[in-house]
Swiss-Prot record:
It holds the Pfam family HR1. Residues 824-1083 form the Protein kinase domain. This is Protein kinase C-like 1. SMART domains: C1 (SM00109), C2 (SM00239), Hr1 (SM00742), S_TK_X (SM00133), S_TKc (SM00220). It comes from Saccharomyces cerevisiae (strain ATCC 204508 / S288c). Residues 560-577 have a biased composition (Polar residues).
Length: 1151
């Protein structure tokens, strides 16, 4: 639609509204009926509101037309002015001012245009759902009538009748909004689907608590009029939560109720309020509206924050007295100190009042009913999940970091499906039905479907390249691409790929001109080329193809397998199935006797025994292995998929699998029988010869390699003991080595051994040596070290090389001292949290103090934090390499079976959270700490590391008065300028808006956290606070930071720059990174070179009584016993291998 056509359309709608006003005014003059006059007044009021909206839309359209005709110069000037105002007076982008859903359903709605768009989508969806309800109830009525169940039939019929009335209401309301809607998609700045699709998860989260709702009165409702009754009918109001009736008012004929309800809610989402008229014995719905519990909770939060700000007298940046003028350093110090003292007195007075008034805060307003009328409601909601926190100065408290763990992945045709929660209505891209709350979504292409449907998806994920496809996989040769064209969406429809509701308008929607499916513009290239065919039909065809291929392969395999199996079974005098023959062919061979054993002993079957007597434990293990083999044979016989997979192995076994025995004539007998069976199947002769030759060669090589490994292992052990071990130690080691070989021979599958149990002191030292080399040089990777001889051929060569390596490095390894937890005395607990514990420890060798951070391996494995642990170690080494003055350095790291340990330098001055909670920081002191933190962040960013967990608890104070950043658990490397990541992590009050929106983000998130940190140091409270995480997140996304009205302009300026919600416009987000922040007027009297070289005297030096003084740490930590709970070893070899190379022992270690 062109601008001229759109302008004509708006003028027509304006004329309609003017006619409604004239007609209602004329009718009102000619009647004395009170009801008619009231209706006319309502029509006039609504028409004037619509008229104002249409005239405003016409002005916007003409302005846009003028801008296009004059060029873009004027718009660029306006944008430049807006960006200047945006940079200092507001931290929000002009496009971010979107009203909440609760604001849009209020009678005094701030934006009628947004309400029209929101209600059009909601009414379309409700209409579709109600039609489904009506259809289902109609079918149920007929079914119950057939069964003769009159009671259930009447209930279903009543439900169908109510759905009929609801559909009439919704259609009427939908036509009302469609009549005045103006489509501005040609020059729209903001997509319509922001209200739903891009809402963070917590915005529509199910809540638990107590809902307080007061229903006072209603007005302008179109009640049912009957000529038989002079009085208005009785009216009720019902309250539903997630389609369940929770409360109902008393009947009223004058639309006044004045009733209050307190409704306990358990994981509720949507509230429905419906007005019913009672006609005879039936209730007929006449008006309806919907609210979300999360919107009510957000409204209560804003109202509570507003009350607190009014009591404090704080304002946003645009109302600061100083404006943009920059005060002198002395003036800013005095002003801020005065403000801080005022804050202290105010916050101390209001802490108790804030707690007591939380449950009493409510919102009262007139809300719009559909299709006509308004209702006066008083709404309040108290969450039962709110955490009672100890209120300290300004409300600052400790909070652990959060991180989104990796979800379980379900793979299907290259898709990586994970289970996701959705709090708006989604549509399955496979079957087309609605999803309620949860579904399976591909991490790569965002394809969405039910859990029950994901196994039926036949289309490849776009992330799967052609080289990843299986050549034998069944394919559907239906390649008819869609013809997607831009189209205007006029109803509520869902994307056929990602399942989200499609926005209204033309820019973001595509429709296939052939088959009619619709999708987002960004999803069009992901939709498979199945034009004219549904997903379900494609799946049926593909399954038929797969079944046909499977049956054909089964027929080919059955005839020859049966013949050959019967011939072999007859020849051996036993009936052996092909699967058992395959099992025998693949079974490991018995070990060969050693060279010094002249005659084979019966006791040596399956092992090398040091004695000639039977060992009852060994016999028991052998019997258990036999029992396991029988279970495996039974499983193989019953598993068709396994038979398909092992078809080649079966054929090999059928021709060349002799009985395993020590009888040297057995092989000849079995070969003779095999030749006999081959004569009965001439068609397979050439293939069978090839298979038999390969198997015999494989057997010979295997026996030779096993014998060689045993000989080499014995010789190497002897060489290692020469000139270093006395006779007694040598005998002890010989006995241990023999036991090791016995255990190795007994264990048929040695995949669950523990490398940490297998290490002797020498191999442990070798591993430490290799680990330190690998970390410092970052060029050599540590090869696994193991003393066991593996029984699989692919592990034999590495074992030999590892043993040789241990012999070569023995002399050097013997000089390196081993460090373990036994080398330390554990003194006090310094802190604990999600990560584990930090314990003050003293070295037994040097009496040096250190802080040991202890992490449990099983927690790291369960939470998929292996990469985080590696990154933490890497950042520790980065800080230690240059001995950075403001970063915590690492002494060493080591591990046990169940834990890993970082031995760090002990910083005895406590963290800044303790100091801020116990003493207010002056501006000079806060600026000094901020400068040192800034230089630490600069070093991280210059080396491609983002920190992501900057907060007061992670900044420690040294005995000299300087700061050091600690806890590198959330750091990520390889984050240079322009690189992005998307992990949802951080401490709630410090998380940047782009993280909460689950967008990809850059190093700019550290500058947002730096702004929050500086705000807390100067004003002793958070710029964005709430009673729980969801409230904090909402505050970060929607609220402006507030300041004392007399705060200095330079302080406000740096806050506004760092706390800008748009990451591209944020201070420090450019290529110059920290240099932008260092050039701010706030730091103009700071010499950063002197700060870096510790030439500036700290403004505060903590009083530390002794090296072991922990008075600056929380007593709840230091009073806990410094012990580690014993843990059972539950990690497998593969899990332990994840921690290989973690240990770090520098050459100059002095512990």
């Amino acid at each position: 639609m062109s601008f001229s056509q759109l302008e004509q359309n708006i003028k027509k709608k304006i004329a309609v509204e003017e006619n409604i006003i004239r007609g209602a005014s004329a009718l009102k003059k000619k009647t004395s009926n009170v009801m008619v006059i009231q209706k006319c007044n309502t029509n006039i009021r609504e028409a004037r509101q619509n008229l104002e909206y249409l005239e405003d839309s016409l002005k916007k359209l003409r302005l846009k037309t003028a801008q296009q005709s004059q060029g873009e110069n004027g718009s660029e000037d306006n944008e430049r002015c807006n960006s200047k105002e945006y940079g200092f007076l507001s931290t929000k982008s002009p496009n971010e001012h979107i009203f909440s859903r609760l604001d849009l359903v209020k009678y005094d709605c701030p934006s009628l245009a947004q309400r029209i768009q929101y209600m059009l989508q909601q009414l379309e969806f409700k209409l579709q759902v109600e039609k489904q309800y009506q259809e289902a109830n109609t079918k149920l009525t007929k079914l119950y009538q057939i069964d003769g169940d009159q009671r259930s039939s009447s209930a279903a019929e009543g439900g169908a009748m109510e759905s009929k009335y609801r559909i009439q209401m919704l259609n009427k309301a939908l036509k009302k909004y469609q009549a005045i809607n103006v489509d501005f998609d040609q020059f729209k700045h903001q997509p319509n689907d922001i209200m739903d699709n891009q809402q963070p998860k917590f915005r529509r989260k199910q809540l638990t608590g107590v809902l307080t709702i007061g229903i006072t009165a209603a007005r302008d409702v179109d009640h049912i009029q009957s000529p038989m009754f002079a009085r208005k009918p009785e009216s009720y109001v019902t309250i539903k939560i997630d389609d369940t009736i929770k409360a109902r008012t008393k009947p009223s004929r004058n639309d006044r109720w004045s009733e209050d309800f307190q409704i306990p809610v358990e994981k509720g989402n949507e509230i429905e309020i419906t007005v019913y008229d009672k006609v005879n014995d039936s209730l007929i719905p006449v008006a309806i509206m919907w609210l979300l519990l999360s919107d009510i909770a957000e409204e209560i939060r804003k109202k509570k924050a507003g009350q607190t700000n009014e009591q404090q007298g704080w304002v946003n940046a645009s109302n600061i007295n100083g404006g943009s003028s920059l005060a002198s350093e002395e003036g800013s110090t005095l002003t801020s100190t005065y403000s801080n003292s005022a804050i202290q007195s105010t916050s101390a007075k209001n802490v108790q009042g804030e707690n007591t008034s939380t449950s009493q805060i409510s919102t009262n307003s007139w809300f719009v009913l559909e299709p006509s009328g308004q209702i006066l409601l008083t709404l309040g909601f108290h969450k039962s999940s709110q955490i009672e926190r100890k209120q300290l100065m300004g409300g600052l408290h400790r909070h652990g970091a959060i991180i989104n763990r990796k979800e379980e992945i379900f793979e299907q045709h290259g898709h990586h499906f994970v289970q996701k929660s959705f709090y708006n209505i989604m549509c399955c891209a496979y079957c087309g039905d609605f999803l309620r709350y949860t579904g399976f979504q591909c991490q790569d292409c965002k394809f969405l479907c039910h859990k029950k449907c994901y196994t039926n998806v036949v289309t490849k994920c776009i992330a799967k390249t052609s080289t990843d496809t299986d050549p034998d996989e069944a394919k559907l040769n239906h390649r008819i691409p869609h013809r997607f064209l831009p189209t205007s969406n006029r109803g509520t429809k869902w994307c056929c790929h990602c399942g989200y509701i499609l926005p209204w308008g033309r820019h973001k929607v595509r429709k296939c001109s052939e088959c009619g499916i619709m999708c987002h513009a960004q999803c069009a290239h992901l939709v498979p080329d199945f034009c004219g065919m549904s997903m379900e039909m494609a799946n049926k065809i593909l399954k038929t193809i797969q079944d046909t291929k499977r049956n054909q392969e089964k027929k080919k395999r059955t005839v020859p397998s049966a013949q050959l199996g019967s011939s072999i079974g007859t020849a051996n005098g036993s009936d052996l199935s092909p699967s058992k023959l395959a099992e025998r062919a693949n079974a490991p061979l018995p070990p060969q006797p050693r060279k010094h054993d002249k005659t084979p002993s019966p006791q040596k079957v399956g092992r090398d025994s040091p004695t000639k007597q039977h060992d009852p434990i060994i016999d028991k293990r052998i019997s258990l292995q036999t029992h396991g083999r029988e279970k495996l044979n039974k499983f193989i016989d019953e598993n068709e998929a396994y038979l398909n997979f092992t078809e080649g192995a079966q054929q090999t076994a059928e021709f060349s699998s002799p009985e395993k025995t020590l009888d040297p004539t057995s092989n000849r007998r079995s070969l003779g029988l095999t030749d006999l069976s081959i004569e009965h199947s001439q068609t397979w002769e050439s293939k069978d010869d090839l298979m038999r030759d390969e198997l015999e060669l494989w057997k010979a090589q295997r026996e030779e390699m096993e014998l060689e490994i045993k000989q080499d292992s014995g010789e190497i052990q002897e060489d290692l003991e020469v000139d270093h071990i006395d006779l007694e130690t040598k005998q002890k080691l010989d006995w241990e080595n023999k036991n090791d070989f016995r255990e190795a021979d007994l264990t048929i599958d040695s995949t669950h051994t523990n490398p940490f149990r297998d290490m002797n002191s020498e191999t442990f030292q070798i591993e430490q040596d290799h680990a330190s080399k690998e970390v410092l040089q970052e060029t050599v990777s540590l090869a696994p070290t193991s003393t066991h001889a593996s029984r699989t051929t692919d592990q034999q060569s590495p074992q030999k090389s590892q043993t040789s390596t241990s012999a070569k490095h023995k002399k050097r390894a013997a000089k390196r001292r081993k460090v373990s937890l036994d080398n330390f005395v554990l003194l006090k607990v310094l802190g604990k949290g999600n990560f584990g514990k930090v314990i003050l420890s003293k070295s037994k060798n040097t009496d040096r103090l250190c802080a040991i951070k202890v992490l449990k391996k099983d927690n790291i494995i369960q939470n998929h934090d292996i990469e985080s642990a590696r990154a933490e170690k890497k950042v520790f080494l980065l800080a230690t390499k240059t001995k950075h003055p403001f970063l915590t350095n690492l002494y060493c790291s080591f591990q046990t079976e169940n834990r890993i340990y970082f031995a760090m330098e002990f910083i005895g001055g406590g963290d800044l959270m303790w100091h801020v909670q116990n003493q207010r920081l002056s501006v000079r002191r806060a600026k000094f700490y901020a400068a040192e933190v800034l230089l630490a962040l600069k070093y991280f960013h210059d080396n491609g590391v983002i920190y992501r967990d900057l907060k007061l608890e992670n900044i420690l104070l040294t005995p000299e008065g300087h700061i050091k950043i600690a806890d590198y658990g959330l750091c990520k490397d390889e984050m240079w300028y322009g690189n992005r990541t998307s992990t949802f992590c951080g401490t709630p009050e410090f998380m940047a808006p782009e993280i909460l929106k689950e967008q990809e983000y850059t190093k700019a998130v550290d500058w947002w956290a730096f702004g929050v940190l500086l705000y807390q140091m100067l004003l002793c409270q958070s710029p964005f606070s709430g009673d729980d995480e969801d409230e904090v997140f909402n505050a970060i996304l929607t609220d402006e930071p507030l300041y004392p009205i007399d705060m200095a302009g330079e302080i406000v300026q740096i806050f506004q720059g760092l706390l800008t919600k748009d990451p591209e416009k944020r201070l420090g987000a450019g290529p110059r990174d920290a240099d932008e922040v260092m050039e701010e007027p706030f730091f103009r009297n700071i010499n950063f070179d002197d700060i870096l070289n510790l030439r500036v005297k700290p403004p505060y030096i903590p009083e530390i009584k002794s090296p072991e003084d922990t008075s600056y740490f929380e007593q709840e930590f230091t009073s806990a016993p410094p012990t580690l709970t014993p843990l059972p070893s539950v990690l497998t070899t593969s899990q332990q291998e994840e921690f290989r190379g973690f240990s770090f022992m520098p050459d100059d270690l002095d512990l």
